[in-house]
Structure formats: C-alpha cells, structure tokens
C-alpha cells in the first residue's frame, strides 16, 4: 500500500511510498534492507541466509497436494458486530514472527489493546512465506521459512492469536505482481503480460516489477492452488487480497490477451488503454476469476471469509481494473479495508466522505499508516485518524506492526500512548 501523497493518478501498480494510494512495499525493499530468513533445503542440506534461492531445475506443473499438518477446526468470525481493529505483519516484521518469545509478547500486547484481526504476509515477491508444496513442486522455490526455534511462524501465530480471540487472515500481498528476478517470472515468461509498447515491467518505488497475466488459466490456477493450500494446511479465519489482485490499465497487450479479446468481441484491442469497453472487458475477467476463486475457497471451508484491501473505488477500477464495487454488490468479498494513507488529518477525513465508505452491505474499514521502519506516525495524528473512523462506525487496520510501537525509539512509551487511544483492556 502507499502513502504520503495526495490523490493523484499515480503509477497504479505501486503499493509504495510514492503513489499516495497504497501500502509500504515489503518485497524487494525488504530484501535490500537485509531481511534474513532461516531456510531449510528439502534435500536435507544446511540452511543459508538469503530469502531468494538460486535457480533450481525446470518445473513440472502438478496440482497441490495439501496434507493438513494442523488439526482442522471451524474458526468462528468475530465481526461484523465488533468493528475491525487489525494490523498487517509484513516481511519487515519477520524478526518478530520468527522469534517465539517476541511473537508471544506481541500477540499478548495486541490482545490487551483489543485487536481483532491479524494479516500475516504469505505471498510476496513470487515466493510463499508459509509451508508450501505448491511453490516447491513447481520449482518456484526450494526453501521453507522457519522460526529461530525451528517452528512454522504462521502456525505459531495462528495458535497464539486464536487463543486470544483474534482472527488470522493470511495476506496474499503480491497478487499478480512479481519481481522480474523471481523464479516465477524467469521460469514462466509466457505468463507475463505487457504494455502496448511491449514493456513487461513497470517501475515502482522499490524497483521493477512484472505483472502475471490474470487472464491466463495457468496464472489463475497458481493463485487458486496457493490460496487453497493455505486454507487447508492452516486453521485460518479468512484470506486477504489487496490492490495487487489487479492489473495496471496499461497492461493487457500481450499476444494471448489480444487473441482472447478478438475471439470474444470480434475486435482488435483498442490502442487507448482507457477505452471504456476495453477497461470493462479486462475488469470483468478479473471479477470472473475472483468469483471462481471464492467458490473454490468456500467449498474447502464454508466459514472462511474473503477480505479485500483496495484503493478507493474510482482509482481501483479506472487505473487497476479492480471493480470492487461490483465485488461488494455481488457478495464476492466479506470485508473491505480501504487504503487511505494521507499525511494529515484534514485530507484523511475528507476521504472518509467517499460514497463507497458509506455502504452498509458489509463491514467497511480503513487502513491507516502506522509508520515506516524507525519513522512512526506521530501519535496525535494516529489518534485523530482513529477517532475520526470510530465516530463514523468504521473499523481500522494499521500498516504495519513494527512502527506501532516495537520499532521506535521508545517502545514502552509508545505502547502506553497507543493503549490510551485504543482503550487497553
């Protein structure tokens, strides 16, 4: 997600600092920042300190074979009677997620503060951050993220949080996006879409990214298999997609999509990326995939809910082909957390008048920037935003965990202030 700039037709692919629309990038930027994961190599070799492994041999494309490692339960949802109080766990929070004692303390504190929902990252940079047979069978990665004590961080988080009455909703952060250096992008160049000029990458604040073609069955199958794997292996309450479950409107000019459009419409793709019929056709294709994905997930677990964290509706549709107003109307999502990262209270509260936030069909919440690394959002601004949301009956989710209090110069003092704002139990 992005923040700090006013509403602008910014580069729609980015959830980074520069677009003013989305969330702090946690993929390539996290790698540059030196995040080190404990990696176990399936063949029994020693672990090594690098999040992205060297290229393995070419993959077969098998279906997933999820064998539940955790006893299945039927998790119960807390909402909608209780407004959302959520927080994302990103790759920048791996130091907490991988350390058992730190994670226990974090979850206890979040419980005391009244948090209802945790969103841990499971899909970032073309790699899975859960125990994934799907990516390993496809030779997209040959490592599994483990905690410092050898534990599965996601399973540990779920166990701790649900004991505190909190929901855990794994977050598929990258959606259809991937770095060009990822095994996914290198092994399947035919899965990538492109602009009218033939470019397959776009620049973001974190560097170059490619976009998987959301209209290709193979791409849809990969995301479906990953999501089904997570809800089968883990006792999660839901899954979350966000502004990267989309496609920048300048993309879709690859040969596969051109042929599909001509076959279905009898016309060539318009040169104008913002042509209304061309926008609608691509957006409807993404909607159709979400419809099928929801059906598959609900068949696996009827109690599961689908969360979405998009940009505001006009931006999402016109620039990202993400027609989430239709998704709400058609019951394809059960929770919406709109990204509104604004640098001051005045511009933030002005955004709360958007019509899509007034809907009563399902719980509506707003994502608030807690800060970046060692630059936490000033507590008076955080307090003003939380109060503005609560006055309107809207839930709140913080991006992300570390700058709430842990990664600050005075964690204890910051935690006390946060407790005063949220009403520590």
Where are these regions (language model features)?
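The substrate-binding groove and active-site-proximal loops of carbohydrate-active enzymes
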Residues: 89-97, 136-149, 207-221, 275-285, ...
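Aromatic-lined substrate-binding rim segments of carbohydrate-active enzymes
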Residues: 126-172, 281-293
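Aromatic- and acidic-residue-enriched segments that line the glycan-binding/catalytic groove
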Residues: 130-142, 176-203, 243-270
